[in-house]
Amino acid sequence: MQYQHPSSSALGLSVPLYAPTPLQPVHPTPFYIDDILGRSSASNGTPALPTPTLPSPNSSFTSLVATYRTPIYEPTPIHPAFTHPGAALAASYGASTYANPLYPFSRPVSEYTHALIRHDTLGKPLLWSPFIQRPLHKRKGGQVRFSNDQTIELEKKFETQKYLSPPERKRLAKMLQLSERQVKTWFQNRRAKWRRLKQENPQGNKKDETESLENICEESQERCLSAEQKSRESSLDEPTSSPTSQETLDSEVSDDSDQEVDIEGDKGFYNCAH
């Protein structure tokens, strides 16, 4: 006996329904055509056709369509749990609201989208991507943390001098065990901060400028005094007169005292007087 469902003609499918060794599942199920035909023929004596109704996701019609897609006879018996075509999908994907082979993605869409979203340490969701999740390269220079001694020395230098020449920068970097680039960057940032504070509080900056000028003047005065003191000490160490100059002076004095100088007209003057 060959039976063709009306829906198969509409779908353009023709599947032979010969089953030399029909499978008898442990638990009877209404999803086999033989069971449906057997029940309908037993009740009416003639094969009854199902009335065309709107199929539901769990109706026998959707299972019938699934049977057209796969043969209903097997050469060897299979496990009863997989007699339903959607059982394998249910076992692999788990139970869901769409227990139907027509919906291969049995899990809700939110579960798949949740798998693509990752939360970082700050709690902000990030869309997962192999390009987004690549580790970010750190900046070559990096943020340098100066020690307290280095900061104090840099501040002292900045109070007296806002700009450094290359030799001074090199000398200061060598003294503080820093690189010239680090010293240059620190002075640039410090000048920017100084300008910002100057714009916000001009009166306070004037006081700072006067104090810095006073400090500079005091330092210059100390330098001048030290230079004068050194010059005085050096002058005291030197002799007042050299021996050669003293000998020449003595010789000149002796010559003047020992020699007699004849003055013209002296004799005539004396003769006239007498």
From Swiss-Prot:
Coiled coil: none annotated. Gene3D superfamilies: Homeodomain-like (1.10.10.60). Residues 237-248 have a biased composition (Polar residues). GO terms for biological process: anterior/posterior pattern specification; embryonic hemopoiesis; heart development; liver development; negative regulation of DNA-templated transcription; negative regulation of transcription by RNA polymerase II; positive regulation of Wnt signaling pathway; vasculogenesis. SUPFAM superfamilies: Homeodomain-like. Residues 197-274 are annotated as: Disordered. Pfam families: Homeodomain. InterPro entries: HD, HD_metazoa, Homeobox_CS, Homeobox_DNA-bind_prot, Homeodomain-like_sf. GO terms for cellular component: nucleus. Keywords: Developmental protein, DNA-binding, Homeobox, Nucleus, Repressor, Transcription, Transcription regulation, Wnt signaling pathway. The keyword ATP-binding does not apply. GO terms for molecular function: DNA-binding transcription factor activity, RNA polymerase II-specific; sequence-specific DNA binding. Disulfide bonds: none annotated. Recognizes the DNA sequence 5'-ATTAA-3'. Transcriptional repressor. Regulates the differentiation of both endothelial and blood cells. Probably plays a role in the proliferation of vascular endothelial cells during blood vessel development. Establishes anterior identity at two levels; acts early to enhance canonical wnt-signaling by repressing expression of tle4, and acts later to inhibit nodal-signaling by directly targeting nodal/nr1 and nodal2/nr2. May play a role in liver development. Induces heart development. PANTHER family: HEMATOPOIETICALLY-EXPRESSED HOMEOBOX PROTEIN HHEX (PTHR24324:SF5), HOMEOBOX PROTEIN HHEX (PTHR24324). This is Hematopoietically-expressed homeobox protein hhex. It comes from Xenopus tropicalis (Western clawed frog).
